[in-house]
Amino acid sequence: MSEAYKQAGVDIDAGNEAVERMKKHVKRTFRPEVMTDLGGFGALFRLDTKKYEKPILVSGTDGVGTKLKLAFAMDKHDTIGIDAVAMCVNDVVVQGAEPLFFLDYLAVDKVIPEKIEAIVKGIAEGCSQSGCSLIGGETAEMPGMYAEGEYDIAGFTVGVVDESKMITGASVAAGDVLIGLASSGVHSNGFSLVRKVLLADKGMSLHDHVDVLGKKLGEELLTPTRIYVKQVLSVLESHEVKALVHITGGGFTENIPRVLPEGMQAVINVGSWPVLPIFELVQGAGNISYPDMYKTFNMGIGMMLVVKPEDAVSVMEKLQELGEQAYLIGNIQAGERKVVYNGVEW
């Protein structure tokens, strides 16, 4: 039966080899609460409810979009898994939750054990960076569904927060301060536009060395999404944070209002942090307007914290102790629930 299945395009033996290869990477992410090994039908996790008065589970799921196209073109697969984890756990920590475990879904045209191992190694690295366990996953070999050498990846995470410590943004008020944490680059959003402008329209190659970037274009674009979980949780232990914003698809313009109460707007002081060269390259090459840039990209800020003005200095100092590049980038004022930009001609 397995030989007939192999002739149909599904190689069970290759799948088994891939599982063996990934085991060492997966196991290094296991927290003490993990109760199962690889291979079970369902993964078990013992939540210590005694640590919480009213534990609330927080879930998130996401993928990495067309950044995958760059991994295919560069034949580099060991960091895209970090992106998959980052997109999920950064969303969960925004609620004040600690990510507990992560599951992945990987769909491929053909199982190549070495490639699967590289992808899962990246997922495990992302889990290690965020302190959550890679508790399970699915690798689906589906001949005829994907072009040769291509795959898709998605992730799912569950975290926990005590109800009294949930962060909702409900208390955000005029005078509060916005602190931005530096991104590592484009992260995992806006790549359809990046690819159109730089590759299709300008004819650049991913293997081109770009002086303003100091590296090959493909290396810059595949830089993994930063994971902010441990830093944010550390700040939450000692400081009140009214709201957190993960800058993903929709950029500043779409994401910041998601945490603002009615009657409050965010004022962003453009120029109060360094915009990364990759964004200047894309904007210049595509003649893209500032409104489009700030509605598409993170512009060098991957996570934002909203704090009381009297807490801003101590929060900044804490973040710097944790190795973060943190910037005071704006404030909250009364007005229509939206983002207002100072310092740039719109």
Curated annotation (Swiss-Prot):
Pathway: Purine metabolism; IMP biosynthesis via de novo pathway; 5-amino-1-(5-phospho-D-ribosyl)imidazole from N(2)-formyl-N(1)-(5-phospho-D-ribosyl)glycinamide: step 2/2
Enzyme Commission numbers on file: 6.3.3.1
Highest taxon, organism lineage: Bacteria
Annotated signal peptide: none
Annotated CDD domains: PurM
One Pfam short name: AIRS_C
Subcellular locations according to the entry: Cytoplasm
Catalytic activity field: 2-formamido-N(1)-(5-O-phospho-beta-D-ribosyl)acetamidine + ATP = 5-amino-1-(5-phospho-beta-D-ribosyl)imidazole + ADP + phosphate + H(+)
Keyword Cytoplasm among record annotations: yes
Keyword field: ATP-binding, Cytoplasm, Ligase, Nucleotide-binding, Purine biosynthesis
BP GO terms, sorted: 'de novo' IMP biosynthetic process; adenine biosynthetic process
Record's GO cellular component terms: cytosol
GO molecular function: ATP binding; phosphoribosylamine-glycine ligase activity; phosphoribosylformylglycinamidine cyclo-ligase activity
Annotated family: Belongs to the AIR synthase family.
Entries under NCBIfam families matching the protein: purM
Name assigned to this protein: Phosphoribosylformylglycinamidine cyclo-ligase
Native source species: Brevibacillus brevis (strain 47 / JCM 6285 / NBRC 100599)
